């Protein structure tokens, strides 16, 4: 079985690509990858020996471009699509699996032109423009936000350590690897009140804001586990009883799988406002909060147990394995 995985650009897309790669590897698939020289694709997969071959095309997103720049971006995708077709033919690829993002365009279009099965993983509650365009032609679209609610590929640690939270003793603020100033500012404005109630603070600041936030805690003599980024972030997350976070799909499903209640602060400039729609999905099931100016007192008075319990239907293991098994069945029919 020869599988071409394509797409990426950002960590959300790429973490899914990595999870699916590892699940396909367990099925002894021969794997290939096509991405872009833009974004993070190369830093994730350029030296990944699990892939038989990797191609990184000089392509960019089309959505926010106008005039000559849009024409140039489309031309680059068409050119890359011919190169993708060549790889697919030469390597006798059985199926293409797209995780979305502009870097998936070339290989996805190549698959359709060659009448090859195309499978799409849509991470968000609102489809990206490329996925919206390609979905009607795909063999199957996997998504955790719409029926049949496919399990999301997250690290097994989030399921293995899941627990229903009964009281708030530890809170984690997740500013992301780049940092979210809004979340960092909120954490600092809450810190004294949380300290008064003996709530342990874990705070991922992101690299850009680390020094400012670290200095604040030191100056105010507030004990906190403050760090810019940690490769073992999952170990920090599972210690917490409540999270304050952006609502990118991968983070949201990691927290949900761990039964960790959260206050989500959607990134306001996300394409199609998808972070807001991601957060609202859990909010409508009384399984999370969406930021509306809440105070630390609002969090301290929460029924943590009820919110954590309401996450149970959304906590499912082996998302990547189940998606891969489904793909394999459809290929082998």
UniProtKB/Swiss-Prot annotation:
Superkingdom, taxonomy of origin: Bacteria
Q: Keywords on this record?
A: Cell cycle, Cell division, Cell inner membrane, Cell membrane, Cell shape, Cell wall biogenesis/degradation, Glycosyltransferase, Membrane, Peptidoglycan synthesis, Transferase
Mind naming one GO cellular-component term on file for this protein? plasma membrane
> Which reactions is this enzyme annotated as catalysing?
di-trans,octa-cis-undecaprenyl diphospho-N-acetyl-alpha-D-muramoyl-L-alanyl-D-glutamyl-meso-2,6-diaminopimeloyl-D-alanyl-D-alanine + UDP-N-acetyl-alpha-D-glucosamine = di-trans,octa-cis-undecaprenyl diphospho-[N-acetyl-alpha-D-glucosaminyl-(1->4)]-N-acetyl-alpha-D-muramoyl-L-alanyl-D-glutamyl-meso-2,6-diaminopimeloyl-D-alanyl-D-alanine + UDP + H(+)
Q: Which CDD domains match?
A: GT28_MurG
Presence of keyword Glycosyltransferase = yes
> What are the subcellular locations of this protein?
Cell inner membrane
Purpose: Cell wall formation. Catalyzes the transfer of a GlcNAc subunit on undecaprenyl-pyrophosphoryl-MurNAc-pentapeptide (lipid intermediate I) to form undecaprenyl-pyrophosphoryl-MurNAc-(pentapeptide)GlcNAc (lipid intermediate II).
Q: What is its EC number?
A: 2.4.1.227
Q: Which family does it belong to?
A: Belongs to the glycosyltransferase 28 family. MurG subfamily.
* One Pfam short name: Glyco_tran_28_C
Membrane topology for this entry?
A: Peripheral membrane protein
Question: What name does the UniProt record give this protein?
Answer: UDP-N-acetylglucosamine--N-acetylmuramyl-(pentapeptide) pyrophosphoryl-undecaprenol N-acetylglucosamine transferase
- Can you name one GO molecular function term for this protein? UDP-N-acetyl-D-glucosamine:N-acetylmuramoyl-L-alanyl-D-glutamyl-meso-2,6-diaminopimelyl-D-alanyl-D-alanine-diphosphoundecaprenol 4-beta-N-acetylglucosaminlytransferase activity
What InterPro entries does this protein's entry cite? GlcNAc_MurG, Glyco_trans_28_C, GlycoTrans_28_N
């Amino acid at each position: 079985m020869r599988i071409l995985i394509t797409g990426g650009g950002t960590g959300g897309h790429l973490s899914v690509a990595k999870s699916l790669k590892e699940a396909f590897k367990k099925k002894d698939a021969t794997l290939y990858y096509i991405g872009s020289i833009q974004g993070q694709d190369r830093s994730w997969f350029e030296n990944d020996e699990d892939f038989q071959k990797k191609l990184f095309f000089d392509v960019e997103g089309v959505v926010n471009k106008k005039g000559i720049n849009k024409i140039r971006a489309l031309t680059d995708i068409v050119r890359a699509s011919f190169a993708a077709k060549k790889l697919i033919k030469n390597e006798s690829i059985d199926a293409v699996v797209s995780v979305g993002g502009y870097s998936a365009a070339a290989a996805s279009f190549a698959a359709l032109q060659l009448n090859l099965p195309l499978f799409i993983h849509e991470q968000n509650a609102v489809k990206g423009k490329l996925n919206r365009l390609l979905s009607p032609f795909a063999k199957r679209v996997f998504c955790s936000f719409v029926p049949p609610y496919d399990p999301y590929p997250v690290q097994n640690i989030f399921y293995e350590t899941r627990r229903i939270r009964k009281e708030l003793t530890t809170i984690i603020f997740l500013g992301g690897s780049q940092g979210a100033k809004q979340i960092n500012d909120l954490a600092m404005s809450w810190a004294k009140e949380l300290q008064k109630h003996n709530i342990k603070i874990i705070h991922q600041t992101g690299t850009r804001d680390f020094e400012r936030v670290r200095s604040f805690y030191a100056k105010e003599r507030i004990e906190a586990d403050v760090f810019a980024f940690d490769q073992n972030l999952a170990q920090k997350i599972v210690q917490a009883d409540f999270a304050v976070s952006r609502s990118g799909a991968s983070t949201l499903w990691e927290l949900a799988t761990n039964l960790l209640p959260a206050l989500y602060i959607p990134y306001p400039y996300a394409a199609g406002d998808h972070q807001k729609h991601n957060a609202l999905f859990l909010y409508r099931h009384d399984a999370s909060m969406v930021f509306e100016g809440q105070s630390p007192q609002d969090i301290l008075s929460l029924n943590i147990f009820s919110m954590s319990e309401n996450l149970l239907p959304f906590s499912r293991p082996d998302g990547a394995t189940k998606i891969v098994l489904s793909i394999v069945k459809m290929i082998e029919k």
